[in-house]
Amino acid sequence: TLHDKQIRVCHLFEQLSSATVIGDGDKHKHSDRLKNVGKLQPGAIFSCFHPDHLEEARHLYEVFWEAGDFNDFIEIAKEARTFVNEGLFAFAAEVAVLHRDDCKGLYVPPVQEIFPDKFIPSAAINEAFKKAHVRPEFDESPILVDVQDTGNILDPEYRLAYYREDVGINAHHWHWHLVYPSTWNPKYFGKKKDRKGELFYYMHQQMCARYDCERLSNGMHRMLPFNNFDEPLAGYAPHLTHVASGKYYSPRPDGLKLRDLGDIEISEMVRMRERILDSIHLGYVISEDGSHKTLDELHGTDILGALVESSYESVNHEYYGNLHNWGHVTMARIHDPDGRFHEEPGVMSDTSTSLRDPIFYNWHRFIDNIFHEYKNTLKPYDHDVLNFPDIQVQDVTLHARVDNVVHFTMREQELELKHGINPGNARSIKARYYHLDHEPFSYAVNVQNNSASDKHATVRIFLAPKYDELGNEIKADELRRTAIELDKFKTDLHPGKNTVVRHSLDSSVTLSHQPTFEDLLHGVGLNEHKSEYCSCGWPSHLLVPKGNIKGMEYHLFVMLTDWDKDKVDGSESVACVDAVSYCGARDHKYPDKKPMGFPFDRPIHTEHISDFLTNNMFIKDIKIKFHE
């Protein structure tokens, strides 16, 4: 049954940090299928950005993918788990569970329960160990520890620690890179992931926009992009320990500069950036065979996304290199570039921890600026593309406790640690932490359909801050860099007046519910029609930015476009539409023909956003209030 399968999958991820015994990995005893894995030592920090780690992970998930049936997959995975690096094993096993047909409907347990040490600072984990060791042997009562602050106000960036260190955001980033591994080889799997390069651009662009909104909410200036490969970088201390080895994710002192590694020189990265920018301005990229591939409006962003990341779909890996991934690796090794001190890398090396570091956002704004440079070569959308004839949006209301105001507060949350680390025999070991949460709300959009027939519309909802850090109104073309997508959905409009109502919990960017390890072991919420994309998505408690105490003003932007022109064949039957805007849809095309981020993905030549509007758009000013 599905439940039995789910239990077997859960057991693969239980107590992973102590699954391998260092020095016990005599590979000769293992199945011949596993001969290409076991290079990365158990206890080392696995990096989803380092080419060597990624290649070994690819070998392993291809072995899992090739397993004859579900039973064979579980058995070979159980064997690999005994000697393969635990982070690499989790990555490969998750990719396999997410993509094997006989695993449809199964969930991977939440990464924050598999590796709580990547999410919960070491002081709290240490406290849990201590509490477990000083109690009588027969005592099984639950243990609760509190997560302590990891910094203080001497560091201006500390004001955003609540956001960067949010468990849900970091788990989303880990999961997104499993659904879209950079080593995914469409020729080998016989499945192309639709618009994967463009999704890489869009998902990270939205992360940057959301981070800037959060900075403005805290009275800080929007971030400055990383810009110059020779500049000293700001420091960061993660306070995380890697339980599998007992070593910590290295902090980065203030003022270090990027330095050459054995694998890559900084001058090579400068050259990669130059070559990509040259190609953008020439309007084409050079393929491996020397032919030119035009960066047209339809595929340009997708081609660039594969180049910049870079993934297996890069048109010319030798020439354009691997800019984004090497940036993560060099920043993570900045404190010990040649390995002379045997230091562990910093958090930038790992997708489940890199969002904690402020430098992540500076780096990604730098990457986003490359795409921005390309988007600026495209013509602004003209009236005919933006307009939806006969459709007029007359008003928009955001319904909450107070109309057009969203209230935020801090909420207490507990994370179960016992499946990842369990010293002793406690029934449960939980870490208590606080995260932001906003009240649920809904949108009511009043639309007039002036035609005589029913129309199908795509409703696109965005939010953007009204004022910049100095209190000036943000101009339209600048605004599009901080516009965040809140929702996108299909609706039917009858002739005459229509009111379209949509709840915030149904958003196309957020994850509505993630079952815990315990839920999965007990078979809660299992359904054969669910797909892997159901566990990818932005955390719903951070759908909107936090605002401030007096109520920060935002533009709520609503646009209706013609669904008959937007629809993609076959996208009606997508089993999981949870976070389709950021995560796409399994084995289907991305269910929207328009470019991701439309209409804010191209230059806007009007000064005020109000001059940009056509009849099918509407802007309502709303407030977001934060209560201590």
Curated annotation (Swiss-Prot):
GO terms for molecular function: chloride ion binding; copper ion binding; oxidoreductase activity; oxygen carrier activity. Disulfide bonds join C534-C576, C536-C583. Cu cation 2 binds at H324, H328, H364. One of its GO terms (cellular component) is extracellular region. Coiled coil: none annotated. Cu cation 1 binds at H173, H177, H204. Its main location: secreted. InterPro entries: Di-copper_centre_dom_sf (IPR008922), Hemocyanin/hexamerin (IPR013788), Hemocyanin/hexamerin_mid_dom (IPR000896), Hemocyanin_C (IPR005203), Hemocyanin_C_sf (IPR037020), Hemocyanin_N (IPR005204), Hemocyanin_N_sf (IPR036697), Ig_E-set (IPR014756). Glycans are attached at N449. Keywords: Copper, Disulfide bond, Glycoprotein, Metal-binding, Oxygen transport, Secreted, Transport. It is found in: Secreted, Extracellular space. Hemolymph. Belongs to the tyrosinase family. Hemocyanin subfamily. Hemocyanins are copper-containing oxygen carriers occurring freely dissolved in the hemolymph of many mollusks and arthropods. This is Hemocyanin II.
